[in-house]
Amino acid sequence: EKLTLNMLYAGGSFGRRSNASSDYVVEAARIAAALPGTPVKLVWTREDDMAGGYYRPTVLHKVRAGIDGKGAVVGWDHVMVGKSIMIGTAFETMIVKDGVDATTVEGASDTPYALPAYRFEVHNAREGVPVLWWRSVGHSHTGFAVESFVDELAHAAKQDPLAYRRALLPAGSR
């Protein structure tokens, strides 16, 4: 069958457009094949979009740290388990290095804080749930995990959370 596909070039490649296996293209082609000579415009309803779209990856963070008598961090250990959004895609060779998806770990593997005895470990979960990004990638979950834990440390040290964060920043930070 001969079909002409007119794509709207707009924005980035987010949502369904970011995945080579997106089924909306096949759906539009099948409709067009059933209606020869008739232009077809496929628009999913919000409900179809939610049911047919991919999911945001579930991520588990386990963060531990040690503080001294003055509340200063003396060691930081962060383990993260989650499914990569890039492994298995055309972007894998560009973004995944040594098995680590940079978009998944951003904000945890490179915190703005000067943390002594810092250790970060990531494990890529393998399960059958299809995942993609939703408005953000790593920072959406790593920011919450890191900053919530810094709040816990400030509380344990009986210090103001903002002052505690400022003390964790490297000298000369803005």
Which positions does each model-derived feature cover?
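Structural alpha/beta core scaffold segments of enzyme domains
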Residues: 1-174
